[in-house]
Amino acid sequence: SHKTITFASAGALLYVSSSNAGDTTQSVTIVGLDDNYDVITETIDLNGLDRVAGTKAFLRVNEVTLSATCSGKVYVFYSSTVSSGVPADLSKVQSVVLTGALQAYNAIYTVPRNRNLYLTSVRYQSTGSTTAHDVVLSITRTLYGASAETLKTIKYVDLGNTNYTDGQVDFSDQPIFFPAKSIFKVQAGLSGGTAMALDFMANFIEEEIDTTPTTVTVIDKAAYLAKLAGLSRTLS
């Protein structure tokens, strides 16, 4: 299966498919960003194992939901051939909805151009591992045009043997700022243990910002000096 999200360099059409031939009555709603980092939404109907193309160019995929649960995995991806409903080029996959689930929020999110986000808390839950092991969660931020930086590292011990771990870290006294066009990402790593299931939830305060273009009138130096001279005569 795919492990990382590879961003497109420019907006492109998305495709959807299922790994089960019987998934033909469900629809896939995709929320993401276009080349201008504006929010766009598109709904595409599934046709089982066959890939179905959308009509809008997506630069980013932030959220995917289904109209009803499916019997197979649902893939959202850029152009790729498929085999039994699975994209042949997994680097094109932007999101996967697991069998029986209704949604798939990636552990990565690009902020729209007219928004600022403030991370106030994170909650993590894990279970299903066969042995105890250390878990490390890393929260990274990538500013527009810059490299990724790690803002917070969370370490805890999963006890394994079907134990359930539930923890929360609060940033409400000093929220972490994610400006427009920046990327929020969570990565998880572990030492030992197998078959762990990890859930992660981030809480944000959203701030709308004004992105209306403004016009500035510029005059040359000679005209500016003449205008100042005229003002001087008027004042005298």
Predicted region positions:
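Beta-strand-centric surfaces of beta-sandwich/beta-rich domains
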Residues: 1-60, 67-235
